[in-house]
Swiss-Prot record:
Pfam families: DUF702. One of its GO terms (molecular function) is DNA binding. Restricted to lateral root primordia. The gene is LRP1. It comes from Arabidopsis thaliana. A motif (Required for homo- and heterodimerization) lies at residues 256-259. This is Protein LATERAL ROOT PRIMORDIUM 1.
Length: 320
């Protein structure tokens, strides 16, 4: 084996980025290596290999990367805090709205959840009386209110005073309707005497008017003591209130002193011979026979809207 000369010797130095020392120390080392190689006269070829990424970064680059990462982390933290703050605010707003609603309900300004009207203060369901009762809730507000409006109270105050005239008028009306059915025997006899005298062409018999009629129309001095009047009696059919049977009666209307007197004459049965004659003796049917010296006359009819009556004892007549 021959000797190897120094010119054939190659020294392989590691690449620059494989140096663990600082930049200054690495450059000094390369300078020393180059100087040694030049002194030896041997070429130095650096070893170029595919190594790991650069690890030795300057301080400014490291600081920049660190600040960038820190800024990104801070942004993420800010976003997280913002989302948390937003959700917290929503929760707080909802809680405050619920509190305000409960406060408004407690203060008496709450509205019904169903119809929107004002809710009752005592209602725990926050509803008006109608909705609360219709839904079947157990609430103390279901008791019916005893409040009465002012208009209704005025009506109640006026009704007792106004009820008396109404009651009086109803009583008078009812009594007026019952009077034709309840006629005293004395008045019937007087009316029968008037009918007998007026229809038999005989001098009319005088009779004294009832005191109740005189007192009802005014003082006794204003009414004549005796009245002679010709009257026409109209035959009508009436129905009894007790048994509902139909019977015939005569209706008379007399005007005395500006007042109208009317009444019914009911059948009282057969009278004795010395009493008043029967209806057949009055010849209302228009027969041509004479009876007891009384000539027959035409049927007497009651013209419509004609009131019969007489003056104050000076004769008889009729008024339309």
């Amino acid at each position: 084996m021959g000797m190897v000369g120094l010119r054939d010797v190659f020294l392989v130095a590691p690449a620059y980025h494989h140096q663990n020392a600082g930049v200054i120390s690495g450059s000094d080392h390369m300078n020393s290596n180059a100087a040694a190689a030049a002194a030896l006269g041997v070429g130095v070829i650096p070893l170029l290999t595919a190594g790991t990424p650069q690890q030795n970064v300057e301080d400014s680059d490291i600081n920049f990367l660190g600040n960038n990462r820190r800024w990104q982390n801070n942004n993420n933290n800010h976003e997280t805090q913002y989302l948390h703050f937003k959700s917290t605010n929503q929760t707080t707003v909802g809680t405050s709205s619920n509190n305000s609603g409960s406060g408004s309900g407690a203060s008496g300004t709450a509205t019904c959840q169903d119809c929107g009207n004002q809710a009752k203060k005592e209602c725990k369901q926050r509803r008006c009386r109608t909705c609360c009762k219709s839904r079947g809730f157990d609430c103390s507000t279901h008791v019916k209110s005893t409040w009465v409006s002012a208009a209704r109270r005025r009506e109640r105050q006026v009704m007792p005073t106004g009820a008396n005239p109404t009651a009086g008028s109803s009583l008078s009306t009812s009594s007026g309707t019952k009077k034709p059915r309840i006629v005293g025997s004395q008045q019937q006899q007087q009316q029968q005497a008037t009918s007998h005298t007026s229809t038999s062409n005989t001098p009319p018999q005088s009779f004294e008017t009832s005191s109740s009629r005189q007192d009802g129309g005014g003082s006794r001095e204003a009414w004549p003591g005796q009245v002679r009047a010709a009257a026409v009696f109209k035959c009508v059919r009436v129905t009894a209130v007790e048994d509902g049977d139909d019977e015939y009666a005569y209706q008379a209307v007399v005007k005395i002193g500006g007042h109208v007197f009317k009444g019914f004459l009911y059948d009282q049965g057969l009278e004795p011979k010395e009493g008043f004659p029967s209806m057949s003796d009055l010849h209302l049917g228009g027969s041509a026979n004479n009876h007891n010296g009384v000539s027959a006359s035409a049927p007497i009819l009651d013209p419509p809207n004609v009131v019969y009556g007489g003056g104050g004892g000076s004769g008889g007549g009729f008024y339309s």
